[in-house]
Design a protein with these regions (language model features):
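A cross-family glycoside hydrolase active-site/sugar-binding cleft signature
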Residues: 37-40, 134-138, 190-192, 231-235, ...
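Glycine-rich anion/phosphate-binding loops
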Residues: 103-120, 159-175, 301-309
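Short helix-terminating capping/connector loops at secondary-structure junctions
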Residues: 126-131, 181-186, 274, 318-325
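Active-site loop segments of alpha/beta catalytic cores
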Residues: 135, 154, 160-266
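Short acidic/His/Gly/Ser-rich catalytic and metal-binding motifs that mark active-site loops
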Residues: 142-147, 197-201, 290
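Catalytic-face loop-and-helix region of soluble metabolic enzyme cores
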Residues: 249-362
Length: 363
């Protein structure tokens, strides 16, 4: 299924709020067409991605937590082979359509208060004029370089551990897609993976472009099988051809900082748009310059920046009609590191630029 959102506003995921109700109210006020459930990492350590996205691996004993956050695969445990086999059994059952198996991926109590409040709010108030609902999971490379084996080596470098992480994140994303789909709207599920920038870097020689592309496509295929549309978000600069060539529905990136490198791939951008892809333009700064960039911008200045970006894309023979219809307007990244007033301003500017989107293509 392809979509034409026409510059609608949504967010990336995280907010600085401690109160889930206030966070949901903010999202629904400024992103009414594509509300997302808010991640609240400041509110509770269990909102950290290890607990939020990898709870099944903890439940099965595949992962252990050291201290508050450091997670490692317990590969040396005598029960490791049986635990891995149990995990793959759950994955295969879910892949064959078992809702009971997929429900093993439900967030544990306290791990996603924003999700709980978001879904309760949708059930109580309805979804108003929403056209889509959005969820998000951690990225494979981000998780794979933070989680280690017992010797401290990043899990991503171990093919078995990497595959377990990929399938776990695919399951979690599919569970979100299926759960949001029950409200009767299409679900957009983003994999948030800033560490994907490391693909092809000399100090990450174990990160193969071909393997990353294959993994992205496997993730996308699995989530689509649960009824979701699939995006990847990165707030770091990278070789954008990787995402443009992947089988994704949406590419989300920090356009405030990195539009100049993204536009260097006009042929791939054209091809991506022509096959129905959507670009989520992160046009509102979130942390660039330690907050100074946000303080120095207003709606008029952001419209000017966006207009110049569109002119550059047109100069490179990218079809503006496709850009107009197949775009989203978002913050550059999540807003958890900002203050609550700064986060509100980011969302205000996002909504304002989305409202002005179509006017940028006239005159």
């Amino acid at each position: 299924m392809s979509i034409s959102p026409g510059g609608l506003a949504t967010g990336i995921g995280s907010l600085p709020h401690l109160d889930a109700a206030a966070a949901v109210d903010l999202v629904r006020r400024y992103c009414p067409a594509i509300p997302h459930w808010p991640q609240l990492p400041r509110a509770n350590k269990r909102e950290y991605f290890t607990y939020q996205n990898l709870q099944l691996l903890l439940d099965l004993g595949l992962l252990q937590i050291e201290g508050d956050r450091h997670a490692l695969f317990d590969c040396d445990a005598p029960e490791w082979p049986e635990r891995v086999a149990e995990f793959y059994g759950i994955y295969l059952e879910a892949a064959e359509g078992s809702q009971q198996a997929l429900d093993r991926l439900a967030f544990s109590p306290g791990a996603a208060d924003g999700w709980d409040r978001f879904c309760d709010d949708l059930a109580a108030r309805g979804y108003g004029g929403a056209r889509f609902l959005k969820g998000q999971v951690a990225g494979l490379l981000t998780a794979g370089f933070e989680i280690t084996d017992p010797g401290g080596r990043p899990a991503y470098y171990n093919p078995q551990l990497r595959d377990v992480l990929l399938k776990q994140l695919s399951l979690q994303a599919a569970w979100q897609a299926r759960s949001l789909g029950r409200f009767g709207l299409p679900a957009l599920i983003f994999m948030d993976d800033p560490v994907i920038y490391s693909c092809g870097m000399s100090d990450r020689i174990g990160v193969s472009r071909e393997e990353v592309l294959t993994e992205l496509n496997e993730f996308a295929s699995f989530v689509r099988s649960a009824g979701g549309l699939v995006g990847v978000h990165s707030c770091a600069d990278l070789d954008w051809s990787l995402l443009l060539e992947a089988e994704l529905d949406i590419i989300s990136f920090d356009a405030y900082q990195f539009a100049s490198s993204f536009v260097l791939f006009p042929e791939l951008i054209r091809s991506f748009l022509e096959r129905g892809g959507v670009v989520a333009w992160g046009l509102i700064p979130t942390f660039h310059g330690g907050g100074e960039a946000l303080a120095g911008e207003n709606l008029a200045s952001l419209q000017g920046r966006t207009g110049r970006l569109l002119q550059e894309l047109e100069r490179r023979a990218v079809d503006l009609r496709l850009l107009q219809s197949q775009s989203l307007v978002t913050p550059a990244c999540g807003t958890a590191i900002l203050s609550e007033p700064e986060a509100v301003r980011v969302y205000e500017l996002t909504a304002g630029l989305a409202t002005a989107w179509n006017s940028l293509f006239t005159g």
